[in-house]
């Protein structure tokens, strides 16, 4: 019997991609598959993301993995290249790059490349993480247009800081600034990621860049993906390896952080922080055992966690436990833990078995 297993529903992935296309019908779709496809398996996700027009990654190694497994669609390096030594690799493997700073621009100007590279100029429209500031924009555009190592036309992008907050005034300001700077430009543009394409239709430009929503996880704090019509792609499962009688007043686990208020049965599940399940999960965090919600009871260990099955439980060793998935949204689990579902799905360790269904 396997211990922790992440079951990846590739049919759900395809459903989600089709729904994205329906919601952004006039945009091309750049599927973001960074961080090992948000923990879902880079190669499997790319192979089955048949509705994608291109892929977005964070590291050059991810782009090379995609090329190695036969992906021929465009691939964009979302953080851009890290050093001038990366540029020949981009050319050889037909990888597009973001340019967001002076250092990258100088490397492009000084390089001797066999063919030009497709460049997306990243504009800092208000998030202040990466990108050229508005007052630098025109100078960057002129230098990129003059650079023989840059394929023409130049492309343009930015990123939202608060698109998941509908009442935040920052997003309309970012949209207005980006559109005003790029109005009349010949090159294609991209502004919306998951929250943007769902909540800010005016940000659906020539390209959208869905990430977390593609995997059936919501970018919003007040709605699950299921409530938006999307299907969770990952279900994290394990099983009971012990069912123990615990008396009222007895504690369970390291630090004795949970003390039973009644005679009950406690289930021990074969998963822990060594598998990527957060050690910070507090007492009360929900787990599904045989289809019903039961609370974590006691501190999460490296290889195990414990749940209060209740005094009348009839569960047995070997019974299934679901940590998150179709019937227990990762968003709900994350909220109990005080994190975001992005972190849950991307932090599973190599010890977790990956199982794919088509």
UniProtKB/Swiss-Prot annotation:
Pfam annotation, one family: Ala_racemase_N
Catalytic activity: L-alanine = D-alanine
EC category: isomerase
EC numbers: 5.1.1.1
Binding site for substrate: 129, 302
Named cofactor requirement(s): pyridoxal 5'-phosphate
InterPro entries, per database record: Ala_racemase (IPR000821), Ala_racemase/Decarboxylase_C (IPR009006), Ala_racemase_C (IPR011079), Ala_racemase_N (IPR001608), Ala_racemase_pyridoxalP-BS (IPR020622), PLP-binding_barrel (IPR029066)
Name the UniProt record assigns to this protein: Alanine racemase
Single annotated GO MF: alanine racemase activity
UniProt cross-references to NCBIfam families, sorted A to Z: alr
PROSITE patterns on file: ALANINE_RACEMASE
Species classification: Bacteria, Pseudomonadati, Pseudomonadota, Gammaproteobacteria, Vibrionales
UniProt similarity note: Belongs to the alanine racemase family.
Gene (UniProt): alr
Domain of life from the UniProt record: Bacteria
Function: Catalyzes the interconversion of L-alanine and D-alanine. May also act on other amino acids.
Modified residues (N6-(pyridoxal phosphate)lysine): 34
GO biological process terms on file: D-alanine biosynthetic process
Keywords linked to the UniProt accession: Isomerase, Pyridoxal phosphate
Pathway per the UniProt entry: Amino-acid biosynthesis; D-alanine biosynthesis; D-alanine from L-alanine: step 1/1
GO cellular component: cytosol
Active site: 34 (proton acceptor), 254 (proton acceptor)
